[in-house]
UniProtKB/Swiss-Prot annotation:
Keywords: Hydrolase. It comes from Escherichia coli (strain K12). The gene is yjhR. It holds the Pfam family PLDc_2. InterPro entries: DNA2/NAM7-like, DNA2/NAM7-like_C, P-loop_NTPase, PLD-like_dom, PLipase_D/transphosphatidylase, SF1_C_Upf1. It comes from the Bacteria. PROSITE patterns: PLD (PS50035). Gene3D superfamilies: Endonuclease Chain A, P-loop containing nucleotide triphosphate hydrolases. Residues 276-303 form the PLD phosphodiesterase domain. This is Putative uncharacterized protein YjhR. One of its GO terms (biological process) is phosphorus metabolic process. One of its GO terms (molecular function) is hydrolase activity.
């Protein structure tokens, strides 16, 4: 099993079926990027190897449209890749099944738990790999006994299950008054956060699933936060307790717990509010109410050594159009705070 966390938004027009444009666009882009590798590995064309399933017909159409735009499911293909609702794959199997849940942190998504066959059928159709493309923060929040809770147990059983892929733009956050830019790699991310701390007017929130005091010092973030606090800027750091302390060895886990406690205490002494939450996958920076940065970069834990660096990307949205999204993010965090 595997997953790609996508900070999208599930939508439902009046009387219509639900869809999530960012999930659809990301699935299409991911298939384009991996098509050659998949076909080489299996010795078969993509449509014989991969199936894409989702609970909603509108999402089926959104995924098909995204595939056509990238010319991966067009007339030149030997056959059409199967994209359908969960029941369209009953009686058929694929080596790789991609699942688009559609729901996001903006709504609960109980429908996925109302009928256990939805996820059971989807998972059972995958012979080799079942990959979920969606908002993992929502899946992670569910009770352990629910269908989504059981799925979360297996998806998050290993850090190796997390897929890495470049973030796609959220079209619903873009308007004529929105400025958007992209960050690539460690240096651009570090420069961005230091500049954002220096320019913040009221408050800044940094969501980083992992927190390493060494990285906070090494990057200059500590000094930048201290200067921001001296100007009266409210700073909140949100991190995941389990991510920071998880280890199979009890002694190692206690050691990691001590390091986390120490980091939290130091931040609190600086006047920086630190919130521990249950299982957060988003990596986000929010400045006041008009800047939102979303991506794959772990702000307070990413390695800065060249040979170990990952090529992370983030998207920065500036403008009034992000206010509602920021409100939804804060609401989701409140639900999972310890």
């Amino acid at each position: 099993m595997g997953y790609l966390h996508i900070d999208g938004r599930g939508m439902k027009p009046n009387g219509g079926s639900r869809h999530n444009p960012l999930e659809a666009e990301t699935i299409a882009a991911w298939l384009v990027a991996h098509k050659d590798d998949i076909e080489r590995h299996y010795g078969e064309p993509l449509y014989k190897v991969v199936g894409v399933v989702t609970p909603f017909s509108a999402q089926v159409n959104a995924i098909k449209m995204s595939l056509r735009k990238l010319e991966i499911n067009g007339k030149d293909e030997q056959g059409l890749l199967t994209v359908g609702t969960v029941h369209s794959l009953q009686g058929a199997e694929r080596a790789i099944v991609l699942f688009s849940p559609v729901y996001s942190k903006h709504e609960d998504g109980r429908f996925l738990d109302s009928n256990s066959t939805i996820l059971n059928v989807a998972v059972s159709r995958a012979k080799d790999s079942f990959l979920v493309f969606g908002d993992m923060d929502l899946i992670e929040m569910q009770p352990a006994f629910s269908p989504r809770g059981l799925l979360a147990k297996y998806l998050f059983s290993s850090d190796n299950n997390a897929l890495q892929f470049e973030f796609q733009k959220r079209q619903d956050l873009i308007s004529a008054h929105t400025q958007i830019s992209t960050l690539h790699g460690v240096e651009q991310h570090d420069e961005f956060l230091n500049k954002t701390l220096a320019g913040a007017q009221k408050k800044i929130t940094i969501i980083s699933p992992w927190l390493s005091w060494q990285k906070v010092e090494q990057t200059g973030f500590l000094a930048s936060m201290a200067l921001a606090r001296s100007r009266g800027i409210d700073i909140t750091v949100v991190t995941d307790k389990n991510c920071n302390i998880a280890h199979v060895d009890d002694d190692k886990r206690q050691e990691k717990q001590h390091l986390l406690n120490d980091a939290v205490e130091k931040l609190n002494k600086m006047g920086i509010a630190t919130k521990l939450v249950n299982r957060v996958h988003s990596k986000i920076v929010i400045e006041d109410e008009e800047l939102l940065c979303v991506g794959s970069f772990n702000w307070f834990s990413a390695t800065r050594e060249d040979k170990y660096q990952r090529y992370d990307t983030s998207l920065v949205y500036r403008g009034e159009g992000v206010k509602n999204e920021i409100k939804a993010i804060y609401g989701s965090l409140d639900q999972r705070q310890l």
